[in-house]
Curated annotation (Swiss-Prot):
UniProt-annotated binding residues for (6R)-10-formyltetrahydrofolate: 114, 136-140
Name of the protein described by the UniProt record: Bifunctional polymyxin resistance protein ArnA
Keywords: Antibiotic resistance, Lipid A biosynthesis, Lipid biosynthesis, Lipid metabolism, Lipopolysaccharide biosynthesis, Multifunctional enzyme, NAD, Oxidoreductase, Transferase
Site residues by UniProt (Transition state stabilizer): 102
Gene Ontology MF term list: carboxy-lyase activity; UDP-4-amino-4-deoxy-L-arabinose formyltransferase activity; UDP-glucuronate dehydrogenase activity
Region (Dehydrogenase ArnADH): 314-660
Residues the UniProt record annotates as site (Raises pKa of active site His): 140
EC number: 2.1.2.13, 1.1.1.305
Entry annotation: catalytic residues: 104, 434, 619
Cited Gene3D superfamilies: 3.40.50.12230, NAD(P)-binding Rossmann-like Domain
Pathway: Nucleotide-sugar biosynthesis; UDP-4-deoxy-4-formamido-beta-L-arabinose biosynthesis; UDP-4-deoxy-4-formamido-beta-L-arabinose from UDP-alpha-D-glucuronate: step 1/3; Nucleotide-sugar biosynthesis; UDP-4-deoxy-4-formamido-beta-L-arabinose biosynthesis; UDP-4-deoxy-4-formamido-beta-L-arabinose from UDP-alpha-D-glucuronate: step 3/3; Bacterial outer membrane biogenesis; lipopolysaccharide biosynthesis
Amino acid sequence: MKAVIFAYHDMGCQGVQAVLDAGYEIAAIFTHADNPAENTFFGSVSRLAAGLGIPVYAPDNVNHPIWVDRIAELAPDIIFSFYYRNLLSEEILHLAPAGAFNLHGSLLPAYRGRAPLNWVLVNGESETGVTLHRMVKRADAGEIVASQRVAIAQDDVALTLHHKLCQAARQLLNSILPTMKCGDIPSVPQRESDATYYGRRRPEDGLIDWHKPVSTVHNLVRAVAAPWPGAFSYNGSQKFTIWSSRICPDAQGVLPGSVISVSPLRVACADGALEIITGQAGDGITVQGSQLAQTLGLVAGARLNRPPATSGKRRIRVLILGVNGFIGNHLTERLLNEENYEVYGMDIGSNAISRFLLHPRFHFVEGDISIHSEWIEYHVKKCDVVLPLVAIATPIEYTRNPLRVFELDFEENLRIIRYCVKYRKRVVFPSTSEVYGMCTDASFDEDKSNLIVGPVNKPRWIYSVSKQLLDRVIWAYGEKEGLRFTLFRPFNWMGPRLDSLSAARIGSSRAITQLILNLVEGTPIKLIDGGQQKRCFTDIRDGIEALFRIIVNEGDRCDGKIINIGNPDNEASIQELATLLLDSFDKHPLRCHFPPFAGFQVVASRSYYGKGYQDVAHRKPSIDNARRCLGWEPSIAMRDTVEETLDFFLRSVDVAERAS
């Protein structure tokens, strides 16, 4: 039986080895590239696969149609997921006739979701386990194939329980995989009434509340002990981490957070005292409790506290879905530059936002909006402003995958809009300049211009009409149910991190990235239909400043408004853009590392995009609404934008790749 495996971490290594031992043929393994910001104390699936001579891949988005097609070509009989961190699309789950199966680190249906290992310790459970279950669209909700219980000892911490679960997983897989290979796959439906769901844990969740019962504080220490980030508290402004502790007898009449003694180091909780056995001050070394007290300058009677507040006013919480995208990562940077904003984000990757992952006001979860509905609903309820930025927005995908464009761009985003209506949250929705379609106005006005698209047999319009329909639904919710909204329409924003050269290689990128790839690889620049189509190119910095002002919404002037964000002065044809780009390329200091210019090549849009494509001659915005509502005016010249975008991509090319 041929298997394709998705795996990561120690559990991934155990799963791969168990599948091999059971006599399966492994066609390929999909894993993750290690994150430099993460403590990778665990085994490497990629090294294991390489040593076994098995093809291994680590795509940023395994659910992209390109990868779905490649997995389909492998023709797997069965699919396994062992601690792979991204949920798999239904397209992938349906590729294997025998089904797709996931190993989860709890006794389902309890502790669905993220970090069950840590959550069971936080909650003081005495038992957990591992479960192999059939994969369905909803996370961890499929029929149970087999499970194995694991007792949690009172002295277990996260790492010891992790090792127990790995052993239990191997025993479970050794027992059930041969049976499954013969076609005998047990299936027991989960009882939804018993289901519990837990989200991802973040380092800041380790902050100790000394007003909690001592058992609760001790369990938190156990749950996040090394190599996890640790439970922590503050002595004044000095942070310290507790790595191990024990529960002591009652501390009657002592205020929670008070130091009872320094040798041993004991701190009062709500109903007892926590003895700190080992700990660490700041970024120092791990020491015993009494030495930690000395390092911190603690004396009996001192009070430990929460971190000092920077302001008495609660920060504005902004939820960005698609935070790793072009607009999302630049907007995050702008918001975090202001002290009064906190950003919550979800995306299927984190390469563009890696620079924010350790920021105390940035909270990120890696996930898919089509799957993590519980997390999204919770955070819509929690946050003040919601920006659903997830969309397929590259023209070649409109003709290649029109149904997927509709499902993601309309159906999934409609669900998020309905959450905003339900919890009465403000939504700032990214419409698109594409909604104007083949409008004949000299400049497109948000409130007056007609929205004109082509015939049904031209699927390139699926993106435009999906966005337009959502615009109309949002408007109706505002009129009929009081939804607070602003629609913004970007006009050809450009800048660093627009997309990637690897996306351009498979044709799934914006125009300028494709042109830069041609220059980098020494291939002809393709001018679709001669490149005479005109667009108004807008610098990402100008665009983000306008979007930031929409979020600020001074005087509520943006409520119920549609706002074009573009630079009418930066109008140019694609051919003019290519010529300007070539001129900047020839002057760049890295020019000598790349091949000679291969010339321009005129290509028919039908041959490039497919028969379902139809282009637009011009697209120029009226920005009167932006001027009136935002006091905004774009200021960055197109040449500056082109040069900065080009520089970013050229410096991202590996030196060895340049030389080749």
